[in-house]
Every structure is written in structure tokens, then in C-alpha cells.
Design a protein with these regions (language model features):
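Basic, flexible Lys/Arg- and Gly-enriched helix-loop patches that mediate nucleic-acid binding at interfaces
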Residues: 5-242
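Short, charge-rich, low-complexity alpha-helical interaction segments
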Residues: 1-2
Length: 242
């Protein structure tokens, strides 16, 4: 359909996009909705992914060739949660603008990928680092059933030096602890802890009178934080397993 106008309809004007796509493509209303949800439809050159959005008669609707009307596959997203962000608001970062290296992802981001995501590996508000969100039942089951066996690698900066005696006491905790760097002002510790829970490392440090300055999770099981920056996310790759 011709027409270059970009005026958006107000509530109640025009028709539902799914109805327009169904008529234009000669498919069922459900298949039209699936085409839209899969990012195959543009209105006046702009991708639309909400079947209930409305279009006016003069607006140009384009349907990408070759896209099959099938349900959007569930995905797992890996987020670098910034320090200071509560875990119950971290899902707000799962938007296209924060996608790390989308050109290498092998798939296009769809709003459906961010809906219904469940956080399976929470972090304290003050901590930063890797958090896993998933829509996939197999991943959810793995992270739930094997939670006690999955090793979390966490980098922890503490105030001041850490003496050999304190390090020995840390090593008697459930975690494997080593010193990454040490200076008079602060020490960088590496914790490797299976079944880590929010607050557990802080409790271990409190027990030996160490004051935490920063804490960052860099690995869950076999999945690393990799090249993410705070606030960025990426897809769990097909070959990756926790």
C-alpha cells in the first residue's frame, strides 16, 4: 500500500494491526499476530511488534518475506547488574538499547524476549555482576534443581590488607578464597562458592572483620560475565551451559 505519512492513530482510530496484516497477507488472525511478534512487520518503515497496535488506512504496512508465523522461542538473558540497583527492578534493563553487540547475537531482539523473564540468580542491591533471567523451562529447572552445586565466582574488594591468618580463616568457610591483588588501602579477593546466596559472602567477611567495598559476580557455573559492561545484557549462546 502506498502512502508515506507517519501520523500515528489515536486510541479508537484505524484498525488493529493484526487485522490489517491478516487481510494483506491472506493469513489467519493468529498467524498475523505471530508475524508481528516475530518482528516481521513494519508500519511506515518502523518495526511494530504489538498485534493490538492500530493503523490508519493511509499507513504503509510491509511484511518481511520468508518469516514463518510461529511462536517466539523462549530465551535466556544474561545481565550485568550495576551496583546499587535492586534485583526486583533489574529486568527494566532488558531493552534493545542495552543489548551488547547485537550484530553478533545471531538473532534480532524482540520485546517478547523480555516479557515474563524470571530471575534465577539474584544478587544483593549493593553487589554488581552476572544475573541470569530465563523463559526456558530447561534452564529454570537446571538453575533451581542444581542450585546447590553451581559454583559462583565473585570478586570482592575489602578495606585494608588481608593477613595470612585472616586468609586461613576465610578458607575454612564454604568458599574457596584467594588473593588477587593487595595494597595497604584495599585487597581484592576471589571467592568461589557453590550454591551462593545473597548475603552469604558478606556474612563470611563479617565473621573475620573485613569491610566490603565492592562485590562483583563474574561467573555462574560455566557461564562468564564475558565482555558485558554494567547495565548491558546478552543472550545465552546455544553452546553455553551453566
Amino acid at each position: 500500500m502506498s502512502g508515506m505519512a507517519t501520523t500515528s492513530p489515536v486510541d479508537g482510530e484505524g484498525i488493529r494491526l493484526a487485522k490489517r496484516v491478516a487481510a494483506q497477507a491472506g493469513v489467519s488472525r493468529r498467524d498475523a499476530e505471530l508475524l508481528i511478534e516475530n518482528g516481521a512487520v513494519r508500519v511506515d518503515g518502523v518495526q511494530q511488534t504489538l498485534p493490538q497496535s492500530r493503523v490508519l488506512p493511509h499507513q504503509r504496512v510491509e511484511i518481511e518475506a520468508g518469516v514463518k508465523p510461529q511462536p517466539v522461542e523462549p530465551v535466556t538473558l544474561l545481565l550485568y547488574k550495576p551496583a546499587g540497583m535492586p534485583i526486583d527492578t533489574a529486568h527494566e534493563l532488558l531493552v534493545a538499547a542495552n543489548h551488547h553487540e547485537p550484530e553478533r547475537a545471531g538473532r534480532r531482539f524482540l520485546p517478547a524476549h523480555a516479557r515474563g523473564q524470571r530471575c534465577m540468580t539474584p544478587l544483593e542491591t549493593g553487589a554488581s555482576g552476572l544475573v541470569a533471567f530465563t523463559q526456558e523451562w530447561r534452564v529454570e529447572r537446571k538453575l533451581h534443581e542444581d542450585a546447590a552445586f553451581l559454583e559462583h565466582e565473585v570478586m570482592v574488594d575489602v578495606a585494608g590488607p588481608v593477613s595470612p591468618e585472616v586468609l586461613a580463616r576465610l578458607e575454612r568457610s564454604p568458599a574457596r578464597v584467594s588473593i588477587g591483588r593487595q595494597a595497604e588501602e584495599q585487597t581484592g579477593l576471589r571467592f568461589a562458592l557453590k550454591g551462593a546466596r545473597p548475603g552469604q559472602i558478606a556474612h563470611i567477611c563479617d565473621g573475620v572483620n573485613l569491610r566490603i567495598l565492592a562485590m562483583r559476580r563474574i561467573r555462574i557455573g560455566r557461564v562468564p560475565l564475558a565482555g558485558l559492561q554494567p547495565g548491558q545484557w546478552r543472550y545465552l549462546a546455544p553452546h553455553e551451559r551453566f
